[in-house]
């Protein structure tokens, strides 16, 4: 009986690990900002980012997981067979910095990053202390490149605005 319980526990843990934790929620974006962001300047930056990203993507801001504000969605399938959905562009107003989630591996994206302004970067995120530290037109270009790249490779809800 004990071995069966251990196997069942292991199976549940493996299933939980395989599930994508960053999924759309019904949590209100405004309520999240009020509850999660205690710095008024960061809250103002977050509201400005929401306004810009909604305009740039044509999508309404939506909560993804407990702390990511995403715009649009796309479906991905890895070679391993793991599949899921993710926001096309997103950000999280964390304590240390605004964390931006945009695809940055195209040539245009790399050129924009070189001139974006003051930020730090990890493999998948751009960290910005204040929106005033970066060029918003270059951030727009990064968002457009994300939409372009993702819509070429995945089923994507976002469309580039018509010129």
Regions found by a protein language model. Name each.
Residues 2-163:
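Charge-dense, helix-prone N-terminal extensions
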């Amino acid at each position: 009986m004990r071995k069966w319980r251990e196997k069942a526990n292991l199976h549940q843990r493996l299933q939980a690990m395989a599930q994508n934790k960053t999924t759309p929620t019904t949590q209100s974006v405004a309520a999240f900002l009020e509850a999660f962001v205690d710095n008024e300047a960061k809250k103002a930056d977050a509201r400005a980012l929401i306004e810009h990203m909604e305009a740039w993507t044509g999508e309404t801001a939506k909560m993804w997981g407990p702390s990511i504000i995403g715009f649009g969605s796309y479906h991905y399938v890895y070679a391993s067979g793991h599949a899921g959905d993710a926001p096309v562009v997103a950000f999280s107003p964390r304590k240390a910095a605004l964390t931006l989630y945009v695809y940055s591996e195209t040539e245009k994206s790399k050129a924009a990053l070189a001139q974006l302004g003051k930020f730090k970067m990890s493999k998948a995120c751009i960290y910005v202390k204040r929106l005033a530290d970066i060029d918003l037109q270059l951030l727009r270009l990064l968002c457009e490149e994300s939409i372009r790249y993702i819509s070429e490779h995945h089923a994507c809800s976002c469309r580039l605005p018509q010129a």
